[in-house]
Amino acid sequence: MNTNRRDFLLAGTSIAVLGAFPASVFAADPWQQAADIVARIKPPAFPQRDFDIIKYGARPDGTDCTDAIARAISACNAAGGGRVVVPAGIYSTAPIHLKSNVNLHLVKTAVLSFSRDPARYLPLVYTRWEGVECLNYSAQVYADGQENIALTGEGTLEGNADCSHWWPWKGRTNCGWSEGQPNQDPARNALFDMGAKDVPLAERTFGEGHYLRPNMIQFCRSRNILIEGVTMKNSPMFEINPVLCSNVTVRGVTIVSHGPNTDGCDPDSCQDVLIENCSFDTGDDCLAIKAGRNHDGRRVGVASENIVIRHCRMKEGHGGLTIGSEMSGGVRNVFVENCDLDSPNLDQALRFKTNAMRDGTIEHVYFRNVRIGRVGVAVLQIDFTYEEGAAGPERPNVGDIHLENVTCKKSKYALQLRGFEKAPIHDVTLRNCVFDHIEQPDVLDHVEGLERINVKVNGKLVV
């Protein structure tokens, strides 16, 4: 994998960044495009060679296994690829950096238990933190500029974050923070200011003393990725966060993490992504598609596109199936089907969030056969008032959103759509949907082209 990964991505996705797809791409049945996307996503294959971390010095007895795991990964990579096997037991480790052609495989009852010491997450690495590029702590499992990489098996990744470690950096009392303790806010504001002013990446250095939490899994500028079968718990921040990646499969994972910003799976400026048969139980959005934040996201200019999500289950979280708020590079061609969402602690089922600083286009988004039990606020929320709200010069373009055979048993609102007068939400279609036990009328601020076909709310047909 050469160092011109971004050039490759920009060349391959210029149509997504610079303009909408031609109408000919979208057939009468848009779901044929979803089938075409799935057909071309190919999980990586690996030679049948195993590299057991025990043979490289790892011990499931509390011994630090960081170096042993790194030696096994290097040997596997040097041999041309294979599986680095984590056998049964609990293995203490600092961040793990994957290399090309390596499948890190956790057998059932294997646990990777990650260090709580921030110093172990140095040296600084390239990352995107809340949609802005910088140099910061490594993710717990990290890769940059690699291809043919995987994280598989029935084992568990334990992030070891709690209200005494990592989560207090959020700066909220319900996350263990108290007045007088440091938190992320000064560094977060500084990073966003650097992004707005085009400060060179090499000068955007954070890490020690800045309190910007790492993610659990972050693969950057890489391709041909598989994450399958594993369970993830208690991440410092996002659980799965591919950034500027292509040909990504996330399958059969289980995520349980109720800390701040512990999103389940957040593809950021990624293309050709399949997420299926996963279970999300989180402290933030279960699944959020992103594409960079504000000016920095527009500078990078790579959309998230050609994403299929199916057969997933969402429990607790702020949003079940979410796009944004970091979406300045654009999000398009998203297909969601046969998913279940249900929890009194799930706020929004289908959630879009942006504002007048983000800009960006969200278009060609399709939901079908989505079953929602109980949700706290709204079945469909499109919110232009998120965070900065109207305090900015940009005009988000959000439209061409379609719901078919979506049902809900209980929610405060069916629709909560808040656009801008200068940039209305447009072209939203609901077909054959049933929403029961809805408590309040729809909120429709600056919406154009809303069409409801055979939609029932509390047993009554709505037009």
Where do the protein language model's features map onto the residues?
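Extracellular/periplasmic carbohydrate-active domains that bind, remodel
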Residues: 2-463
